[in-house]
Each structure stands twice: as structure tokens, then as C-alpha cells.
UniProtKB/Swiss-Prot annotation:
Subcellular location: Lysosome membrane
Protein name per the record: Lysosomal acid glucosylceramidase
Pfam families: Glyco_hydro_30, Glyco_hydro_30C
EC number(s) per entry: 3.2.1.45, 2.4.1.-, 3.2.1.-, 3.2.1.46
Signal peptide limits: 1-39
Organism: Bos taurus (Bovine)
Keyword Cell wall biogenesis/degradation on entry: no
GO molecular function: galactosylceramidase activity; glucosylceramidase activity; glucosyltransferase activity; steryl-beta-glucosidase activity
Active site: 274, 379
Pathway(s) annotated for this protein in UniProt: Steroid metabolism; cholesterol metabolism; Sphingolipid metabolism
Membrane topology: Peripheral membrane protein
Length: 536
């Protein structure tokens, strides 16, 4: 069944919270709801029996947002998503000269400045590209608009696997000709030329913002490896500085050359996706093992100099690209060597073992030791652990896990956050080793339909409102609460605050900006809000 734009009766207009008159608790809450205007279209909700809903999209209908505009001076915008089904709904409030509420006070400290943000995005894997391209052109366009356009959540980062990974339907590298040390047979296969590259171009055309690409390899060609296989325990043959290592470093340059021929240039490359994976016996999918010492020497003697002496010398090099549990030691080993450190722009981290690795002891300590080396979250997904269901359509909890991670990362100096697959099928694939996981967008090819999950909107509460160049500033709470909060100043001088409530309790709060006054509001249980206001 094709969906048309829902009528007012089917989906009543959001009513905001003007009805809250508990003056003793909050004062008059001066928020009024903005009706859906111009291009914005409401969510077409569907429940699959989990904690919240997905928004259903097809070739004729998809929910959308208006291009972001700053509220008038003296007012603030509040964008709300809730477990009960609101999705980035806009209401406006008036900034007060005096505080009327008695709940939690969050005070902006604009002089307390921290890291500048690079951005937010996801990965164009083979699996993501296969799913997106299986949609009709109209539905495909709406999916990419949802992620990249002003009517969507305005991603500005795309991760590109260098050749195959587990989210491929076959194993391949860009040069599977044995002992081709000159890389004469290096070539991009159909996965790049017909799947990923056309979709990346379409995304860039739809985006109003500048979009940065970064690439990560999973495995080298097998003839460069000790075990002669794409997976399992194996490293590069020989040692740093030799023919094997130099050939592997030149493979990076060949990749960048090949994409440049397709008019795509990269912001960064990571030295290796999850280098510890290739140190594990029986590792099931593509990997290439490095210890921190091996990565240090490979960067210092091979990858660093070869990139620097190529036409891609401006491409940034990110080390680690693995669990933050490995910090700060991995950074200490690599960055203690000035020959390696001079080539390293940043440290990329994955989220899978975060429950074993407190942010303060890992990210915080690494920033303390290396304040000039940026931290960047390069991969996250839910559903990968053996006890987890791969896909849970409409899970609010999974959305909260994303936003909690993003806020925690921002509070510990991380400059960007990258989701894993941009889109998967209802099984959580395809994946050649059946390592199925969840994704913010699930594509049902048979119905030419895709589902935008709570994870999509949780990410959007950051990506749409925190453009590249925004700077995190202090936001101090008057007392302990159940809220996760973060504040930033945007390049246009306006301020943005994100408030996540993972508890069931409504939390009355006031946001104070010393430059303009007080914003009285409430954070309902199981909700996320983004606040935006001018500071002058």
C-alpha cells in the first residue's frame, strides 16, 4: 500500500506543553507549538511491538524537516523526540529576564571552551549501498535526503571501507593478483564503481553542507599477509620499512588516486580498522593485525611518509580505529615516537567495549596526555553482541544508547561520531559471515519501503544542529539529575544544548544563558530535546 501525506485527522498536530501551568514548580512554561509548515512533513508511525515506533517512508511519502533557521531574538526553538512517538517536533519559547522555575538549573558557561566539532555521519558499506540501490529511484532519493539534505538530519561525514568488510556479499581486495608489488592490477570493482561511488555523489549533491569522507581498510591482499587469508590471525609479512609494508602503504595512495579519478576526495584515512582483530585466532571476517608497536613503526616508516610524499598529503591520518579500552596505552606507544607522531592527526575509537572502559580513564586521560591530537568516534552499532537481537524495529532504548554515547563522547573531547551502516535489511544485513546488526534505517526491499528508527532521530538531534566548527562550552547543573546534557556554540554565534532524559520521570528545568536570560522548560521521561537560541 502506498502512503500519502497523512491528514490532520490521522496525525493530530503536536500540541506542545502550553497546558503546563504548575507555577509553583516551573512558572508559566512559555512554549507554543509550531505547526508543520512549508516542506516539513510529520512521521508516518508504525509499531513493530518494541518500545516506540518507526517512521515509514516510500517513494511517495517520507517525513521531513524544514531547513534550520534561527529563532527570533528573545525566543528559543525546542526540537522534541519522545518514546511516545514525537519526532523532532518544533515548539518555540520566550526567553525570560528572570527565573520563575524551581527545578534543575543548567547554566551556560560560554567562556569555558573545549573542542571544535568535526561532525556526524555513517558508513557507506557494500551492504548499505546494496539496500539503498534496491529501492526505487524516488524512495532512494528520499532516503538520502533524510540523511544529507536540509530537509533531513544533515550528515556531514561518510565512512568508506577500502574494499570488502563483513558487510559485503563476497571477499575481495583491490589487488588480488599474487605478488603484484607494483600494484599494476589495482582496480576498483563494481562494489565501488556501481554501488558506493554513485551513492556518495548523490549524497554530496543533496547536501547543503560540506561532507567529509574517511576511509578504513579491513584487510590487505592475502599475498601480503602471514596467514595468506583475508580473515583469522594474521599480520603483514616482514617488518616495517620492507617491501610488504611499503606496498601496503602505496595501496592507500592507489585507493585515493582511484577515487580522485571519480572526483571524490578524502578528508582522512584510518591506519587500519580494528587492528587488534587480526591478532585473534579464528577471527571470522576481514582483518589485519597490528600491535601498537607495529602500527607505530608502520606509520613512521611507511604509511606516513608515503602519504606525505603523494598528491594526497592533505589527507589526515587517524590511528587506532579500535576500542577505547586500548587507550591511553596505544596512544602512548605510537605518539611517543616523534617520527610516527608527526604524521598522526587524530585517534579514532569504536564503541563496542565502552561498558568496560570508562570515558574519563580512556578518552579523558588520552586528551590530558595528548591535548593536540583529536579524538574521533569512527564506528558504533547496536545488535552486534551475541545476546542481542540484531534488529529491533522501533527500539527507543537503542536510540537512547546512541545519544548517551554521543553526549559522553562530546563531554570527553571527542570531535565527531560516526554510525556504522547507513542502511540494512530487516535481517540486519547482508553480511557474508552473518554478523547481522541494527541500523538507523532499515530497508524492506519487497515493499519498496524504508523505516527510520529512533536511532536516526537521536543522531539527528546532534547532526542537524551542531555543524562543523561548533565548539563545546561549559554547561553546569545546579544539582545531580537523571539528565545527560551538553552545550555548544555554533559558528554563527548561536547556542545549542541537547538534553537527554533516559529515566521515566519528567524533569522541570531552566536553561540560563548569562547573555540573554532564562529558558523555562521540562524534559519529559524518555525524551531527547535540542534547544537553539541566538546569543545577541
Amino acid at each position: 500500500m502506498e502512503l500519502s501525506s497523512p491528514s490532520r485527522e490521522e496525525y493530530p498536530m503536536p500540541r506542545g506543553r502550553v497546558g503546563i501551568m504548575a507555577a509553583s514548580l516551573m512558572g508559566l512554561l512559555l512554549l507554543h507549538t509550531v505547526s508543520w509548515v512549508s516542506g516539513a512533513r510529520p512521521c508516518s508511525p508504525k509499531s513493530f511491538g518494541y518500545s516506540s515506533v518507526v517512521c515509514v517512508c516510500n517513494g511517495t511519502y517520507c517525513d521531513s524537516l524544514d531547513p534550520l533557521t534561527l529563532p527570533d531574538p528573545g525566543t528559543f526553538s525546542r526540537f522534541e523526540s519522545t518514546r511516545s512517538g514525537r519526532r523532532m517536533e518544533l515548539s518555540l519559547g520566550t526567553i525570560q529576564a528572570n527565573r520563575t522555575g524551581t527545578g534543575l538549573l543548567l547554566t551556560l558557561q560560554p567562556d569555558q571552551k573545549f573542542q571544535k566539532v568535526k561532525g556526524f555521519g555513517g558508513a557507506m558499506t557494500d551492504a548499505a549501498a546494496l539496500n539503498i540501490l534496491a529501492l526505487s529511484p524516488a524512495a532512494r532519493n528520499l532516503l538520502l535526503k533524510s540523511y544529507f539534505s536540509e530537509e533531513g538530519i544533515e550528515y556531514n561525514i561518510i565512512r568508506v571501507p577500502m574494499a570488502s568488510c563483513d558487510f559485503s556479499i563476497r571477499t575481495y581486495t583491490y589487488d588480488d593478483s599474487p605478488d603484484d608489488f607494483q600494484l599494476l592490477n589495482f582496480s576498483l570493482p563494481e562494489e565501488d564503481v556501481k554501488l558506493k561511488i554513485p551513492l556518495i555523489h548523490q549524497a554530496l549533491e543533496l547536501a547543503n553542507r560540506s561532507v567529509s569522507l574517511f576511509a578504513s581498510p579491513w584487510t590487505s591482499p592475502t599475498w601480503l599477509k602471514t596467514n595468506g587469508a583475508v580473515n583469522g590471525k594474521g599480520t603483514l609479512k616482514g617488518q616495517a620499512g620492507d617491501l610488504y609494508h611499503k606496498t601496503w602503504a602505496r595501496y592507500f595512495v592507489k585507493f585515493l588516486d582511484a577515487y580522485a579519478e571519480h572526483k571524490l576526495r578524502f578528508w582522512a584515512v584510518t591506519a587500519e580498522n580494528e587492528p587488534t582483530a587480526g591478532l585473534l585466532t579464528g577471527y571470522p571476517f576481514q582483518c589485519l593485525g597490528f600491535t601498537p608497536e607495529h602500527q607505530r613503526d608502520f606509520i613512521a616508516r611507511d604509511l606516513g611518509p608515503i602519504l606525505a610524499n603523494s598528491t594526497h598529503r592533505d589527507v589526515r591520518l587517524l590511528m587506532l580505529d579500535d576500542q577505547r579500552l586500548l587507550l591511553p596505552r596505544w596512544a602512548q606507544v605510537v605518539l611517543a615516537d616523534p617520527e610516527a607522531a608527526k604524521y598522526v592527526h587524530g585517534i579514532a575509537v569504536h564503541w563496542y567495549l565502552d561498558f568496560l572502559a570508562p570515558a574519563k580513564a580512556t578518552l579523558g586521560e588520552t586528551h590530558r596526555l595528548f591535548p593536540n591530537t583529536m579524538l574521533f568516534a569512527s564506528e558504533a552499532c547496536v545488535g552486534s553482541k551475541f545476546w542481542e537481537q540484531s534488529v529491533r524495529l522501533g527500539s527507543w532504548d537503542r536510540g537512547m544508547r546512541y545519544s548517551h554515547s554521543i553526549i559522553t563522547n562530546l563531554l570527553y573531547h571527542v570531535v565527531g561520531w560516526t554510525d556504522w551502516n547507513l542502511a540494512l535489511n530487516p535481517e540486519g544485513g547482508p553480511n557474508w559471515v552473518r554478523n547481522f546488526v541494527d541500523s538507523p534505517i532499515i530497508v524492506d526491499i519487497a515493499k519498496d519501503t524504508f523505516y527510520k528508527q529512533p536511532m536516526f532521530y537521536h543522531l539527528g538531534h546532534f547532526s542537524k544542529f551542531i555543524p562543523e566548527g561548533s565548539q563545546r562550552v561549559g554547561l553546569v547543573a545546579s544539582k545531580k539529575s537523571d539528565l545527560d546534557t551538553v552545550a555548544l556554540l555554533r559558528p554563527d554565534g548561536s547556542a545549542v544544548a541537547v538534553v537527554l532524559n533516559r529515566s521515566s520521570k519528567d524533569v522541570p528545568l531552566t536553561i540560563k544563558d548569562p547573555a540573554v536570560g532564562f529558558m523555562e522548560t521540562v524534559s519529559p521521561g524518555y525524551s531527547i530535546h535540542t534547544y537553539l537560541w541566538r546569543r545577541q
